[in-house]
Regions:
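Short, solvent-exposed secondary-structure boundary/capping segments
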Residues: 131-137, 202
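A short alpha->loop->secondary-structure connector
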Residues: 28-31, 73-80
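S4-like RNA-binding module at protein N-termini
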Residues: 1-26, 34-39, 63-64, 70-71
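Glycine/acidic-rich beta-strand-loop module
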Residues: 41-75
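Pseudouridine synthases involved in rRNA/tRNA modification
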Residues: 1-2, 6-10, 17-22, 150-224
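Glycine- and acidic-residue-rich catalytic/RNA-contacting loop of pseudouridine synthases
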Residues: 20-32, 68, 85-133, 149, ...
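Residue-level signal for inorganic ion chemistry
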Residues: 15-16, 58, 84, 123, ...
């Protein structure tokens, strides 16, 4: 269900497995509740991941720590980087996706042309063969389904994300790869490779991840 990546005085960082609920539902514990049971402490969620998404999550150990992380996330001071795989040729191979988002049908969201309160996403991509590209994504906002909608909007829904038109696969190929933030004047950086997924373990993907080990040091495409 999850792996503990770091256990600090005020927070833990875990790697959530794919296809695991964030919140408890249908009588089964979500990842936060399960971590609380395992560790025997109260944990506070400060951001979330969709069920299909694997990767890094910060869980605070106190309401004070949660308030600080919530402030940082709301002010976009936590840098987040994601990996995704998608089939097909995108409308552009790198750059940004920007636009307002709105609810659509079947729990979906859609990208609009308006810019009143836009979702902003920067990205790079690299071909890994068989018509598949690996995407490194940096969301500058935190909208629901933002990255899933961003890739679908440029013609390449995430592999395994059938809600947005992706081909069926062994998992949804979206992974929260890296986090950078400061807490109590100390800098923290965490990165973890995808824990599952046949396509994530291909030699071409593994080779490209060597080039993206420090995403915060890359020269990212400018966002308008």
């Amino acid at each position: 269900m999850y792996q503990i990546i770091a256990d600090e005085a005020d927070f833990i960082v875990i790697c959530k497995s794919a296809n695991i609920h964030f919140h408890s539902q249908d009588g089964s514990a979500g990842v936060v509740a399960q971590a609380e049971l395992d560790l025997g402490i109260k944990l506070y969620s400060v951001h979330r991941l969709d069920t299909l998404t694997s990767g890094l999550l910060i869980l605070a150990k106190s309401s004070a720590a949660a308030a600080e992380f919530t402030r940082q996330f709301s002010q976009h001071k936590v840098q987040k980087y994601y990996l995704a795989l998608a089939k097909g040729k995108p409308k552009k191979k790198q750059g940004w996706v920007i636009g307002d988002m709105a609810k659509s049908r079947r729990s979906m969201h859609k990208l609009l042309r308006s810019m009143d309160n836009p979702a902003k996403t920067q990205f790079f991509s690299h071909s890994v063969g068989d018509g598949i590209r690996l995407y490194l994504l940096k969301p500058l906002t935190g909208k629901t389904h933002q990255l899933r909608v961003a890739l679908a909007s440029i013609g390449v829904p995430i592999l395994g994300d059938e809600l947005y038109g992706g081909d069926a696969s062994d998992r949804g190929y979206l992974h929260a790869y890296s986090l950078n933030f400061s807490y109590k004047a100390q800098a923290y950086q965490y990165s973890v490779a995808p824990p599952s997924g046949v396509a994530f373990n291909s030699p071409a993907v593994i080779e490209q991840l060597q080039q993206w080990q420090s995403p915060e040091q890359l020269t990212w495409p400018k966002v308008k």
